[in-house]
């Protein structure tokens, strides 16, 4: 997605949690005021550095002309309380969100260049 498309998606609040995923960042699938997405919060088991890595990696990919998903960083105020997969609560502060798009989950069984 182009940088201009990033300006059109601005989640600011979590309306409903769909699922807390068992991933390193403990991403949460959620419905936001801007639609369905995936949100990474402070308080995840990998620490805040994983959110910084996501931000930098996405910016670099965009600069290199690679396709990136729509994303937005917003301030999560701690409400509603969101329980991460590990059982801990998401902490208030910056949250990384990515718009949900339809696609498929790569199992890893087939080399990615054959997809």
Q: PLM features: residue spans?
A:
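Conserved ATP-binding subdomain of kinase catalytic cores across diverse folds
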Residues: 2-110, 115
